[in-house]
Each structure stands twice: as C-alpha cells, then as structure tokens.
Amino acid sequence: MVEFRIPEEISAFFDDEYGKILLVKGAPGSGKTVFALTLLSMLKGNGAYLATRVDPETMYKQHPWIKGEISAANIVDAAQSVRVQKAKEFTIKPLRYTDVPDFLKAIYARTESMEKPVIIIDSWDAVVSYTGYHAQKEREELEHSLCDFCRRTKTKILLLAENTEQTPLDYLADGVVVLESVMYDERRLRRMLLQKLRGCQIKNPVRLFSLDNGIFKSFIELKEEEEKEIAEPHPRAPIPDISDRRISTGIEDLDRVIGGYGTFNLFEGEYITYDIIARALSLNALNLGRSLLFMPWQEQIDRLMPFVEPKYRDNIEAVEDIKDLKDRIAGERRIIFINMEEIEDEEVVKAVIAKIRDHGDVVIGFTGADRGRGRFDFFASTHIRTMFISGVPCVCGEVPRTEIHALELDISTGNPEIRLTPIV
C-alpha cells in the first residue's frame, strides 16, 4: 500500500472552489516533481500534469506507483512531438504554445470538464522558455495573464520552479513553498518551507519530509500526550529476540535497520527521542518475561503498566547509586538502563558496564550530545544518535551507520507502536 502524506495546510489550500496558484521552488533534486505527482495522485485524477522534460513512459518507469494512480490522459507532454506508446495503450497529444492565448486555451481545454481542476506545470521556467517569452517584461505579463486566468476559470495551478530567489511571481502567487535538500553530518535531510498560503493558517512553517520509495511523505510533530489518548490500552504480542546475541529493540522497523541490540547500546543526543525508544524496548522486554533494572528510577515507566501483562509488572527494579549496581548483577539476564548524564564518575561507569557485559546483560546507556562522543562509543555494540528536527523525533545510527530516520507513533491498534521512515 502506497502511503502519501501532504502537509494539512496544503490540502486545505486546495480544498475550496477558488482558483489560485501555488509556486513550488527548489533546486534540482529537492523533490519538486515527486511532490507534484503525489499531490496530483491524492486529488484522484482531478488535474493534469504538464511536463517538459520527462515523457510519460519514462515517468512510469521512474515512479511505478503512479501508473495506477494517475491516468495517461492526465500526463501531458508540453514540449515534445506526438508520442504514441508502442503497445498503443494511449496517445499523448502535445500542446504547442506559440502565444499566450493559445497557452491559456490549451490549459482550459484540459480542465473545462473537471471538477476542481488542478494543473501542475513542471517546470515553469522551461515552459516560459518554450513559449519564447524570454524578456522579463514579457514573462511578467504572461504570469499576470496566468493568474487572471486561474481565478476566472477557478483552476488551481501548481508551478514548479528551480529559481529559489525571490521574483515578482512570489508576490502574484497565492501560495509559495520551498523544498530543501541539504546534508546533515553527511546524511540527507529534506525540509519543506511553507512561506505563504493565502487564506490558510500555517501551523508549522517547516516540515520534515522524505521521498522514500519515490513517494512524498511529510511528518507531523509528535504529541507528547498521545499515548494517554488510547481508550482501551492492552498488551501486544512481543517481538522475539533477533538471535542468541541480539535482542529486539521492540520496534520492528528499528530491528531491520540496526539488527537489534547487543550488549552495550549507547544513545547520544536529545533525551525525549531516546525515552520514546527506551519505552518501546521496556514494553517488549517485559512482555517477554524479562526483568528491567533502572539507574536511576524513571517515573515515566509507571504509565507503561497498562501495556504490560499483569504477571510481569513486578519485573522492574531500580538503584540510585551506580556503585550499588555491581551487587545487583547476578542471576538471570536483564536489561539495564543507565542515564549517564546523572553520573559524574566516568571510570566507575566504565567498570560497571564492563562487568555487566561479562555477565551477558544488555545495557542501554544515554548521554547528552555534549558529553557522549568519545567517552563510551569505543566499546558500544550499537551507537544511536537522537535528535528533534522540525518538531519530529529522529534517529541515525553511528554503529551501524544509517540514514536519518523519522519516528512516528501509531496508536490505532490500542498499543503505542513506533514506525521509522528513512529520510532519503
């Protein structure tokens, strides 16, 4: 199943009867075309995609999911000669723009029978060049005519542009969004900036998004109280160990990314994201019948009890002093959580961790970004960095090395489940 997600502000922007223009700006490779295809797919065929650089056959090969979502009749070759598919499933009739009236008539011909029509032009710069309106004054006249046309005919037009600088079109357009693709510690990071959406409230002006599987998917801020909204909480079937040496993280997606947890697992960075992941492990381990040991006690563990089998709810202990932890390392294999931010004596921590590893217990250690690097990572079997990006909890692996992944909380099953999506 293909999962789309467009920011709710943009969905609201298109969900009325008025004609308007949305200008989508971004450098090559920033995701403009995928965003446009995803949006048009969500509109259930009420629109047309005018491309000047990619023919429909190639587009279907690059984005296989759109063949079942967007009909060939709605993909228009705006600059090339007539193309007929070899299998003769469909014919693409080109639109030859020699002047402004013909250009507008061609658009109107594609939309006059549509309900709430939407036209996507990729790219506006190429179309303007093809029409021969190279002078700045002529281009501005064309853009004014296009704005007037869309309002008179109640047509919504989405213009894709690679010029990220501010131009007169920014003022004419009803909405302006900018897509960014930047490097973050040698990893891909994608953001959408909602600069203007006339008539719509912008709740979050910056949206983290991914193009995973060639689909545009934006992420929303995680609600801190979302778990409390579960009406009938109940335990879920736990995920078994990965192997004799690796246990499950309690998150299926994270298991696939890092292969589970080893003996010492270091989390470095932002605490709230770490806490989300630690709670997932706690629930899974408890429902497998394992015991947990915390140093120090974490108050938020109490709210996990509704999701734990009653017979396992007493399998939790706590110690307040790291030195007391050595005396508790005996007997069955346990999972031990250590907040190293609250411990000053680094050598004692290392000694305790070494003893725990020898016993075969699993250690989950957290430290802030300022203190973590270089202190414990040299003997970590897993090293995960935690962060918040545009209000979204994210992780990336140092050992093993991974892309940035966005975390989402799914409570639809009556149990908090974490899903990960790579930012690619």
Language-model segments: residues:
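Pre-Walker A adenine-sensing motif
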Residues: 1-15, 248-260
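Pre-Walker A (Motif I) flank of P-loop NTPase domains
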Residues: 17-22, 261-266
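Conserved P-loop
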Residues: 21, 27-91, 271-322
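Short, structured coil segments at secondary-structure junctions
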Residues: 43, 153, 171-174, 288, ...
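Phosphate-binding/switch loop-helix module in NTP-utilizing enzymes
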Residues: 84-151, 315-366
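Phosphate-binding/switch region of NTP-binding enzymes
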Residues: 156-215, 367-424
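Charged, amphipathic alpha-helical linker segments immediately N-terminal to NTP-binding catalytic cores
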Residues: 194, 198-242
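Extended amphipathic alpha-helical coiled-coil/heptad-repeat regions
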Residues: 262-269, 296, 312-424
